[in-house]
């Protein structure tokens, strides 16, 4: 029904529009009032009216750095009250993009020592000023179970899982020794744009993408969490998987859209930063950092940039002449200040808690660092206790070219490999300084050598170690085998107060070997030559037991096996120390790509050539939950367990043997079931009387043959 103009005017006079609630329509149809190019600035100085033009001129100059401001009084309006400014002002930019730039660039800007400017979009002030005062129950997402994330540890045969990265696909498999690896999940094409990586305890598998990092886990490796970090390149983890560290070459940039900012994981305080520490439980960033200026222009990035204490309680970053140590989970600076160390070159955390001499604390947090020589000071190596920052031990060094710090896995010993030069500077040689951390006053044993050590490696949970060294004779020809492999162990001193010292128990000269890989369980070590032209692996037993070995000797080295592997690029032990994998990666060359799996004794189990093979990854295992008594029980029943695993191996190797073993097990189960069924029944005796049966056998005692003619 239509109405004329007179009726409309009459209704308009009768109806008060102020009594009508238009809230539902306003929420449904949001009007663009054109305020997005206005910003409101709070925190400005309160100035008398006479000085307001000067203040406006200063602020116009500052805010013009973000974009073009509308000319005249329309561009900047500063409210007045009682002859003074109110401390805030309105600025109109010519476009929305300039207003966004002003918010990003100038929000939090210090105008002077007493005034910090707070810049917000005018439309946001109106939006957040109209928030309802009524409490609204937050919506909690329903709990989503990811299953048992360590289910692979329940495998009856104790098999390990491996990741094979080839072509553009990534697959997870069970290692089955000589047999074809059994897929846990089918290979996924495009699983990662760069590489895949497990967390330190094997709980999560991570894939790298242009948008960020994806965490996978569970029995079927389903998606668990996403971590948005644009163009991320590097990733690292804290030892107990509580935190993840990512690095991107691109700085964090806040989205322009308000809706996108609401979903963005980073706030304004993270803008321009490149390094992010993530909380693995929540999936949220715990702290972000800008790269120090001295790292921004480096072609090769030192990684990791953040190093962790053994229990994730502390982390630290190295900067110019200082060490920044943070407490978790707040990630605030320890005691709110840096640790000043002039010229610090490198630092390392002890990999385990340390029991210092005469200390009640069983798990002290220690870190070591070194500083180079300067005009007024010698080079130094020091051990510091955290959180007290107390320097427990310092050693001065002379004519130092470089230092490398190697902590023993239990944190009881620190070896510092010191590369020194002669006074002429033409010849290099190495010294080894051993800090005995758990003893009184932390004594230091020095081992002086004539060679340059190119590789050093501790045996896990032991005082033995292996070095690869060469004589610096000025002839760098790589075709000449000049490296020496040396096996060291502690020789106990004779007498009551005699000190122990390190002794070389075996040396093998004229080798090309350049890398050392200890089994995670110790005793067995692989010494390898890794190069693009040739490759070789030698397997050694450092506690070989035979009739000629001395029972009390701390080391008896025996070469078990040697295998040539041309084009080998990488080597890795499995977590149990039973197997070693070596592979040729297409990331470095395209010659005979593939992988090999060996037993710890060096026997070759599997040799697979795979086109465009990139990487072989063992899935890590968490530390064993067995107590010392549990381990003792396992050792006492080792023969029984060995028989079970040998049976498993026989079944895997031969289908006929498998069928025979399964049939034998079935027959045994049937027999036991039959016995259990009839065990309680009484035997019915027969009424037939017993009778003795006689049996007569004829036996020929002698036989004669007579011939009649």
Curated annotation (Swiss-Prot):
InterPro entries given in the database record: EIF3B, eIF3B_RRM, Nucleotide-bd_a/b_plait_sf, RBD_domain_sf, RRM_dom, TIF_beta_prop-like, WD40/YVTN_repeat-like_dom_sf
Any one biological process term the GO annotation gives: formation of cytoplasmic translation initiation complex
Chief place where the protein resides: cytoplasm
Pfam families assigned to the protein according to its UniProt record, in alphabetical order: eIF2A, RRM_1
Keywords, comma-separated and alphabetical: Cytoplasm, Initiation factor, Protein biosynthesis, RNA-binding
Annotated region (Sufficient for interaction with HCR1 and TIF32), positions in chain: 1-98
CDD domains linked to this entry: RRM_eIF3B
Domain of life of the native organism: Eukaryota
Gene Ontology MF, one: translation initiation factor binding
Function description: RNA-binding component of the eukaryotic translation initiation factor 3 (eIF-3) complex, which is involved in protein synthesis of a specialized repertoire of mRNAs and, together with other initiation factors, stimulates binding of mRNA and methionyl-tRNAi to the 40S ribosome. The eIF-3 complex specifically targets and initiates translation of a subset of mRNAs involved in cell proliferation.
Official protein name in the record: Eukaryotic translation initiation factor 3 subunit B
Organism name: Lodderomyces elongisporus (strain ATCC 11503 / CBS 2605 / JCM 1781 / NBRC 1676 / NRRL YB-4239) (Yeast)
Organismal lineage: Eukaryota, Fungi, Dikarya, Ascomycota, Saccharomycotina
Name of the gene this protein is made from: PRT1
């Amino acid at each position: 029904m239509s109405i004329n103009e007179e009726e409309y005017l009459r209704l308009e006079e009768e109806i008060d529009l102020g009594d009508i609630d238009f809230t539902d329509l306003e929420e449904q149809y949001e009007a663009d009032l054109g305020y997005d190019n206005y910003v409101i600035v709070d925190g400005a100085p309160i100035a008398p009216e006479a000085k307001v033009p000067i203040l406006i001129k200063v602020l116009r100059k500052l805010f013009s750095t973000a974009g073009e401001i509308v000319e005249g009084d329309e561009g900047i309006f500063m409210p007045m009250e009682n002859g003074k400014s109110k401390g805030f002002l309105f600025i109109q930019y010519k476009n929305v993009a300039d207003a966004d730039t002003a918010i990003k660039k100038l929000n939090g800007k210090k105008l002077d020592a007493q005034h910090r400017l707070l810049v917000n979009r005018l439309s946001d002030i109106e939006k957040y000023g109209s928030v309802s005062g009524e409490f609204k129950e937050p919506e909690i997402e329903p709990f989503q179970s990811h299953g048992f994330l360590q289910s692979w540890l329940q495998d009856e045969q104790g098999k390990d899982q491996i990741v094979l990265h080839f072509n553009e696909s990534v697959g997870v498999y069970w290692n089955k020794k000589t047999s074809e690896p059994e897929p846990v999940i089918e290979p996924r094409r495009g699983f990662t744009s760069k590489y895949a990586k497990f967390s330190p305890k094997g709980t999560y598998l991570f894939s790298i993408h242009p948008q960020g990092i994806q965490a996978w886990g569970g029995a079927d490796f389903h998606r668990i969490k996403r971590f948005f970090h644009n163009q991320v390149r590097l990733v690292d983890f804290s030892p107990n998987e509580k935190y993840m560290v990512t690095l991107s070459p691109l700085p964090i940039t806040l989205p322009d859209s308000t809706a996108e900012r609401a979903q963005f994981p980073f706030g304004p305080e993270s803008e321009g930063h490149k390094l992010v520490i993530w909380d693995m439980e929540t999936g949220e960033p715990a702290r972000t950092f800008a790269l120090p200026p001295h790292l921004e222009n480096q072609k090769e990035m030192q990684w990791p940039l953040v190093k962790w204490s053994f229990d994730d309680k502390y982390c630290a970053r190295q900067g110019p002449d200082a060490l920044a140590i943070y407490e978790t989970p707040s990630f605030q600076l320890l005691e709110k200040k840096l640790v000043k160390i002039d010229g610090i070159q490198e630092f390392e955390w002890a990999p385990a808690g340390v029991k210092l001499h005469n200390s009640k604390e069983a798990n002290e947090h220690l870190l070591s660092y070194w500083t180079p020589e300067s005009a007024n000071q010698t080079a130094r190596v020091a051990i510091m206790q955290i959180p007290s920052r107390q320097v427990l031990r310092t050693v001065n060094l002379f004519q130092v070219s470089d230092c490398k710090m190697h902590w023993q896995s239990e944190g009881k010993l620190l070896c510092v490999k010191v590369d020194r030069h002669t006074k002429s500077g033409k010849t290099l040689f190495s010294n080894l300084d051993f800090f005995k951390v758990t003893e009184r006053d932390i004594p230091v044993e020095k081992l002086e050598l004539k060679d340059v050590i190119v590789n050093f490696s501790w045996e896990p949970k032991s005082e033995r170690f292996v070095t690869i060294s060469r004589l610096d004779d000025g002839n760098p020809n790589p075709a000449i085998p000049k490296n020496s492999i040396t096996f060291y162990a502690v020789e106990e001193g004779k007498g009551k107060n005699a000190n122990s010292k390190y002794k070389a128990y075996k040396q093998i000269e004229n080798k090309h070997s350049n890398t050392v890989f200890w089994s995670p369980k110790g005793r067995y070590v692989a010494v390898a030559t890794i190069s693009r032209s040739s490759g070789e692996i030698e397997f050694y037993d450092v506690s070989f037991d035979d009739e000629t070995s001395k029972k009390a000797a701390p080391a008896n080295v025996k070469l078990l096996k040697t295998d040539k592997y041309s084009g080998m690029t990488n080597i890795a032990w499995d977590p149990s120390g039973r197997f070693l994998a070596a592979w040729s990666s297409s990331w470095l060359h395209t010659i005979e790509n593939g992988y090999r799996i060996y037993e710890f004794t060096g026997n070759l189990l599997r040799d697979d050539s795979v086109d465009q093979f990139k990487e072989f990854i063992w899935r890590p295992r968490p530390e064993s939950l067995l107590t010392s008594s549990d381990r003792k029980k396992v050792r006492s029943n080792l023969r029984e367990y060995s028989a079970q695993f040998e049976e498993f191996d026989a079944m895997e190797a031969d289908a006929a043997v498998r069928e025979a073993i399964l049939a034998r097990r079935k027959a045994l189960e049937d027999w036991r079931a039959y016995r259990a069924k009839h065990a309680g029944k009484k035997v019915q005796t027969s009424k037939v009387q017993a009778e003795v049966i006689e049996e007569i056998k004829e036996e020929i005692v002698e036989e004669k043959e007579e011939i009649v003619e």
